[in-house]
Amino acid sequence: MLDVDLSGAWRTIATVGRIMVTQRSGSIVNVASTAGLVGYRHFAGYVAAKHGLVGLTKAVALDYAPNGVRVNALCPGSVRDSSEYEGRMLAEIARSLGVGVDEHESVFVQAQPTNKLVEPGEVAAAARWLASDDARGVTGAVVTVDGGFTAR
Protein backbone atom coordinates (compact mmCIF):
# COMPACT_ATOMS: atom_id res chain seq x y z
CA MET A 1 0.00 0.00 0.00
CA LEU A 2 2.68 2.50 1.01
CA ASP A 3 4.89 1.56 -1.94
CA VAL A 4 2.21 2.34 -4.52
CA ASP A 5 0.17 5.11 -2.90
CA LEU A 6 3.04 7.06 -1.33
CA SER A 7 6.39 5.97 -2.75
CA GLY A 8 4.94 5.73 -6.26
CA ALA A 9 3.64 9.27 -5.97
CA TRP A 10 7.03 10.45 -4.71
CA ARG A 11 8.85 8.84 -7.63
CA THR A 12 6.39 10.33 -10.12
CA ILE A 13 6.64 13.80 -8.58
CA ALA A 14 10.44 13.63 -8.61
CA THR A 15 10.46 12.65 -12.28
CA VAL A 16 7.91 15.11 -13.65
CA GLY A 17 8.86 17.78 -11.13
CA ARG A 18 12.37 18.10 -12.59
CA ILE A 19 10.86 18.78 -16.01
CA MET A 20 8.34 21.28 -14.64
CA VAL A 21 10.99 23.09 -12.60
CA THR A 22 13.16 23.37 -15.72
CA GLN A 23 10.27 24.82 -17.74
CA ARG A 24 9.28 26.94 -14.70
CA SER A 25 5.62 25.97 -14.87
CA GLY A 26 3.34 23.08 -14.18
CA SER A 27 0.66 21.65 -11.97
CA ILE A 28 0.68 18.38 -10.05
CA VAL A 29 -2.59 17.09 -8.61
CA ASN A 30 -2.14 14.22 -6.17
CA VAL A 31 -5.23 12.13 -5.55
CA ALA A 32 -5.31 11.38 -1.85
CA SER A 33 -8.55 10.61 0.01
CA THR A 34 -10.51 11.68 3.04
CA ALA A 35 -8.41 8.88 4.59
CA GLY A 36 -5.55 11.37 4.29
CA LEU A 37 -7.39 13.67 6.69
CA VAL A 38 -9.13 11.33 9.15
CA GLY A 39 -8.60 7.78 10.36
CA TYR A 40 -10.64 4.76 9.31
CA ARG A 41 -10.79 1.50 11.26
CA HIS A 42 -9.37 -1.61 9.58
CA PHE A 43 -7.41 0.34 6.94
CA ALA A 44 -4.26 1.53 8.73
CA GLY A 45 -1.97 1.04 5.71
CA TYR A 46 -4.27 2.99 3.40
CA VAL A 47 -4.76 5.76 5.97
CA ALA A 48 -1.00 6.01 6.55
CA ALA A 49 -0.30 6.20 2.81
CA LYS A 50 -2.91 8.88 2.19
CA HIS A 51 -1.84 10.97 5.22
CA GLY A 52 1.69 10.71 3.87
CA LEU A 53 0.55 11.84 0.43
CA VAL A 54 -1.10 14.93 1.92
CA GLY A 55 2.12 15.76 3.78
CA LEU A 56 4.22 15.11 0.68
CA THR A 57 1.96 17.44 -1.31
CA LYS A 58 2.43 20.29 1.15
CA ALA A 59 6.21 19.84 1.41
CA VAL A 60 6.77 19.59 -2.34
CA ALA A 61 4.46 22.57 -2.94
CA LEU A 62 6.79 24.68 -0.81
CA ASP A 63 9.87 23.33 -2.62
CA TYR A 64 8.47 23.88 -6.12
CA ALA A 65 6.55 27.15 -5.65
CA PRO A 66 9.54 29.45 -6.36
CA ASN A 67 9.88 27.70 -9.73
CA GLY A 68 6.28 28.26 -10.83
CA VAL A 69 5.16 24.69 -10.18
CA ARG A 70 1.95 24.14 -8.21
CA VAL A 71 1.29 20.99 -6.19
CA ASN A 72 -2.10 20.24 -4.63
CA ALA A 73 -3.97 17.27 -3.21
CA LEU A 74 -7.49 16.20 -4.02
CA CYS A 75 -9.27 14.24 -1.29
CA PRO A 76 -12.40 12.51 -2.55
CA GLY A 77 -14.78 10.93 -0.09
CA SER A 78 -17.15 8.09 -0.83
CA VAL A 79 -17.58 8.09 -4.61
CA ARG A 80 -20.32 6.27 -6.48
CA ASP A 81 -18.60 3.92 -8.90
CA SER A 82 -19.73 0.80 -10.68
CA SER A 83 -16.28 -0.45 -11.68
CA GLU A 84 -15.19 -3.99 -10.93
CA TYR A 85 -12.44 -2.67 -8.66
CA GLU A 86 -14.89 -0.59 -6.66
CA GLY A 87 -17.18 -3.59 -6.31
CA ARG A 88 -14.36 -5.69 -4.89
CA MET A 89 -13.29 -2.87 -2.59
CA LEU A 90 -16.85 -2.35 -1.32
CA ALA A 91 -17.16 -6.08 -0.68
CA GLU A 92 -13.89 -6.08 1.29
CA ILE A 93 -14.95 -3.07 3.38
CA ALA A 94 -18.39 -4.58 4.01
CA ARG A 95 -16.81 -7.89 5.03
CA SER A 96 -14.42 -6.12 7.43
CA LEU A 97 -17.39 -4.34 9.01
CA GLY A 98 -19.50 -7.49 9.16
CA VAL A 99 -22.30 -6.10 6.97
CA GLY A 100 -23.64 -6.71 3.46
CA VAL A 101 -22.56 -4.56 0.52
CA ASP A 102 -25.99 -2.90 0.18
CA GLU A 103 -26.07 -2.11 3.88
CA HIS A 104 -22.50 -0.79 3.68
CA GLU A 105 -23.38 1.68 0.90
CA SER A 106 -26.37 2.97 2.86
CA VAL A 107 -24.10 3.50 5.89
CA PHE A 108 -21.76 5.59 3.71
CA VAL A 109 -24.67 7.61 2.31
CA GLN A 110 -26.03 8.28 5.80
CA ALA A 111 -22.57 9.51 6.89
CA GLN A 112 -22.66 12.26 4.23
CA PRO A 113 -24.24 15.57 5.23
CA THR A 114 -25.54 15.71 1.63
CA ASN A 115 -27.14 12.24 2.01
CA LYS A 116 -25.58 11.07 -1.26
CA LEU A 117 -22.34 9.66 -2.55
CA VAL A 118 -20.03 11.90 -4.57
CA GLU A 119 -20.28 11.38 -8.33
CA PRO A 120 -17.10 10.65 -10.33
CA GLY A 121 -17.69 13.75 -12.47
CA GLU A 122 -17.60 15.95 -9.36
CA VAL A 123 -14.13 14.65 -8.51
CA ALA A 124 -12.99 15.07 -12.12
CA ALA A 125 -14.21 18.68 -12.19
CA ALA A 126 -12.21 19.51 -9.07
CA ALA A 127 -9.08 17.89 -10.52
CA ARG A 128 -9.56 19.74 -13.80
CA TRP A 129 -9.88 23.05 -11.93
CA LEU A 130 -6.77 22.41 -9.80
CA ALA A 131 -4.75 21.64 -12.94
CA SER A 132 -6.06 24.69 -14.82
CA ASP A 133 -4.80 28.26 -14.97
CA ASP A 134 -7.96 29.26 -13.09
CA ALA A 135 -6.24 27.83 -9.98
CA ARG A 136 -2.86 29.45 -10.67
CA GLY A 137 -2.86 31.00 -7.18
CA VAL A 138 -3.48 27.67 -5.47
CA THR A 139 -0.58 25.54 -4.26
CA GLY A 140 -0.13 23.34 -1.21
CA ALA A 141 -3.90 23.08 -0.90
CA VAL A 142 -5.91 20.05 0.13
CA VAL A 143 -9.26 20.12 -1.64
CA THR A 144 -11.99 17.80 -0.42
CA VAL A 145 -14.82 16.53 -2.59
CA ASP A 146 -16.62 14.57 0.08
CA GLY A 147 -20.19 15.79 0.44
CA GLY A 148 -19.24 17.59 3.66
CA PHE A 149 -17.99 14.43 5.42
CA THR A 150 -14.82 16.05 6.80
CA ALA A 151 -16.60 19.30 7.73
CA ARG A 152 -17.83 17.69 10.93
Where do the language-model regions lie?
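A glycine/serine/threonine-rich, flexible loop-to-helix segment
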Residues: R80-A111, E122
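The catalytic Tyr-X3-Lys active-site helix of short-chain dehydrogenase/reductase
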Residues: G8, G39, A44-G52
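Catalytic Tyr-X3-Lys loop
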Residues: M1-R11, S25, V29, L53
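Residue(s) in the substrate-gating loop at a strand-loop-helix junction
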Residues: S33
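Active-site loop immediately N-terminal to the catalytic Tyr-X3-Lys motif
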Residues: V38-A44, P66-N67, N115, D133
